[in-house]
Amino acid sequence: MTGPARPDAAGAGPSGPVPAGTGPAGGTARLDALLSARGQELLARVAAGREAGQSALALASALRKEYPADLVAAATAQDELRRAAAAKFSRAGRMLFTRPGLEQASSEAAARHRAGRLRAGTAGRLADLGCGIGGDLIALAPGRAVLAVDRDPVHLRMAAYNAGIYDGAAGVRTMAADVRDISLAGVDAVFTDPARRLPAARGPGRRLRPGTSEPPLDWCFALTRQVPAVVVKAAPGLPAGTVPDGWETEFVADGRDLKEAVLWSPALATAPSRATILPGEHVLLPADGDEVPVAAPGPFLFDPNPAVTRAGLVEDLARQLGAWKIDPRIAFLSASTAQHTPFARTLRVVESAPWNEKDFARRLRALGIGAADLRRRGLAGDVDQIHRRLRLAGPHRATLVLTRVSEKPWGLICTDPELP
């Protein structure tokens, strides 16, 4: 088994102070201290204390009697990041993170899915450009030669270390550089995850502008001039028309949570678009077929996964389910029978009628509905305000769908059917 790549210590000794600077030098010194024997001992004690139920504040206060205060602060912060990372990584308790690096990193499931496609479609040496803390490197590196590049020296060292946690350090070579300045000679495939969490990428209200990244996506697409096999991870809100002809856009969801768009160059593309649902790697691809009919809602309603909707595959899903659309421009589907599918939530229709808030409020109360999940699509209105005005009461739960049917405002009261 290959252990984690252990960077050489290059700062203060394990018993000395840990520099508190926020620049590369300070971050590297803190990393050195955490990777020292005493730092590893402290990380283990922090984890054990938290597992035993001690608060972070009380634990840090006790540990400062034995360790430098800066080292305790670094260790407790790292432990918090490891706890947060447990939702993404199965070995998070042994990995190293920064908060920005963790926020941008793919989940382990998404990284493994992507690495599997790359492994099936390419051979030879791979470049991971902008590797961050190694969220994808952990899946790309095992059994393959990988050049990991990042201009942040702390992230680069963490990436190599984390690859070792997943037994992939042997084939990893790291390079501290701006990805735009390196040569790709000898590289057979490229994966890049350009940074999207930039101050300039945020508009009013600090919302991320879709498609804004560093390096820009146009630079990422141009990599095919050097290496034909290129994979780009992007935000799922990618504007229409951003991706060049011949590329595949894959929308990846974790359950019903849309996580990312993955762009596959023409050398790797298998379809114009696809929807992938994790866990389980359920894949929906476009297929030729008859036009999907439009009709009134039937006994069952299907609410497609956001990955299906973003990939433009709602009609493909309808054909797969033998379903119809309830409106030409709305992404709800309906059918006469319940079906279990990973690509949509299935709902049993209890009530279907033109939308009138007062009438539906009375009907919901008559059904004993005390809690309702409101799903609005194609109708204006503040969901929270509507929910308050309904004044629900009762022991049962339902889904209230507010939408359009044949261009008319429509409401549906639905429940989850019992499916095998």
Show which residues each predicted segment covers:
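SAM-dependent transferase fold signal centered on methyltransferase-like domains
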Residues: 1-420
